[in-house]
Curated annotation (Swiss-Prot):
It comes from Escherichia coli (strain K12). Pathway: Slime biogenesis; slime polysaccharide biosynthesis. Transmembrane segments: none annotated. GO terms for biological process: colanic acid biosynthetic process; lipopolysaccharide biosynthetic process; slime layer polysaccharide biosynthetic process. This is Colanic acid biosynthesis protein WcaK. Pfam families: PS_pyruv_trans (PF04230). GO terms for molecular function: transferase activity.
Length: 426
């Protein structure tokens, strides 16, 4: 069985890395003989962080070349591509409409040829199909249809759907893939509300729950050992932060208000006698355009006792982060996957909602009270919630352990079911 896993943006986002690692770990357990290739927009850093070979994404390279085309002709082509390219691809796939006879860029033709060497294509999960990210997100899927290969989308959150062209492509792609397996039910409700077809929808989990703890073969690096030692010295709460853009406008807030409010939460945690470690699931490795460490450093100016506020500047992979989060008492995460990684390594987590996916994931876990709307951060009420949670850790840990093991079991069944279907097609 030869599989291609595509759709990873970069493992520089350790959430995307955990999603990919969990899927790979599950496939390795369920079908150790499967031949699996992985593709990412940023293959060099992703390969290092995952500790396995990773191929570059040719469609991303093509898009970068097109976008950097010089001169008036280059700019005109860019505008035309942005407006019509996905309609042309869709016409090619459906073999209908006037646009079907227009030549597509060589990169698409080459990519279709590459896909034909696989038994099936898996579009790895995450929050990939979001209207704000635009229609290029559907290119891989349309090429898979052209290559006439099975396409399974595993562990996704989808939507919102507030753009007509995006919705048209979503309807076609989600209706023609072999399965769109959602990781939470809020996305399903959004699809129904926006009249997006749900015929191929199945309910699953986020594949980051499937990351193996690698208890037998994990060796802590110098940096990881340092942070494990720091966490062992005093009771520790971990936090993760982010630059809110592009969601700040939709949320009606500012980065400054968010940072000030989060500093208030950190100060309350320090008052409760804990130290705080700020970990970052997104760093600027390999030119990735988000670096949460800068937000963590910026927060320091508002912290009452900076000596007990530690910012991790090291480049850690998601598994190493899991080990450090596992040594903490609680995680308060703006990044959803810091919460998932934390809980997978047996540390309870509060996830701050700035998108529907966090509420959906916590709801599914049976811990809806652990997803806190960002409004509660901004109005200061999260401070008391965190203090209450710290007072209820033993009871919470028992519920968490049961919920995570249930989620992992569902996740393994989800991957098994996909592998069985691919085996039948093959």
């Amino acid at each position: 069985m030869k599989l291609l896993i595509l759709g990873n943006h970069t493992c520089g986002n350790r959430g995307d890395s955990a999603i990919l690692r969990g899927l790979l770990d599950a496939i390795n357990i369920l079908n150790p003989h499967a031949e699996v290739d992985v593709m990412s927009r940023y293959p060099v850093s992703s390969s290092w962080l995952l500790n396995r070979p990773v191929m570059g994404d040719p469609l991303f390279l093509q898009m970068k070349q097109h976008n950097s085309a010089a001169g008036v002709v280059g700019r005109v082509k860019k505008v035309l591509r942005r407006r019509y390219q996905h309609q042309v691809l869709l016409s090619r796939v459906t073999d209908t409409g006037k646009l079907r006879n227009i030549a597509i860029a060589q990169g698409f033709t080459d990519f279709v040829r590459l896909l034909s060497g696989y038994d099936a294509i898996i579009q790895v999960g995450g929050s990939f199909f979001v209207d704000l990210y635009g229609v290029p997100q559907f290119e891989h899927a349309l090429c898979t249809f052209m290559a006439k290969k099975p396409l399974f989308m595993i562990g996704h959150s989808v939507g919102p759907f507030q753009d007509e062209q995006f919705n048209q492509l979503a309807n076609y792609v989600f209706g023609h893939c072999d399965a769109l397996i959602l990781r939470e039910s809020v996305s399903f409700d959004l699809m129904k509300r926006s009249n997006i077809t749900t015929a191929k929808v199945e309910h699953g989990v986020d594949t980051a729950w499937l990351v193996d703890h690698h208890t037998e073969d994990f060796t802590a690096s110098y940096a990881v050992q340092h942070w494990l030692d720091v966490a062992a010295q005093q009771k520790t709460v971990a936090i993760t932060l982010r630059e809110l853009a592009p969601f700040d406008k939709r949320l009606g807030t500012t980065q400054q208000a968010y940072e000030k409010a989060f500093a208030g939460v950190v100060n309350r945690i320090l008052d409760e006698g804990y130290q705080v470690i700020a970990l970052s699931t997104c760093t600027g490795i390999d030119s990735y355009n988000k670096d949460d460490r800068m937000v963590a450093l910026n927060l320091r100016q508002h912290i009452s006792d900076p000596a007990r506020y530690h910012v991790v500047m090291d480049e850690l992979n998601d598994l190493e982060m899991g080990k450090i989060l596992g040594a903490c008492e609680l995680t308060v995460g703006t990044r959803l996957h810091s919460a998932i990684i934390s809980m997978n390594f047996a540390t309870p987590a509060i996830a701050i909602n700035y998108e529907h996916k966090s509420a959906g994931i916590m709801q599914q876990l049976g811990l809806p009270e652990m997803a806190i709307d960002i409004r509660h951060l901004l109005d200061g009420s999260l401070q008391a919630m965190v203090a209450d949670t710290l007072g209820q850790l033993p009871a919470l840990n028992a519920r968490l352990s049961e919920a995570v093991s249930r989620e992992r079991q569902t996740g393994m069944q989800m991957v098994q079911s996909v592998l069985e279907r691919i085996g039948e097609v093959k």
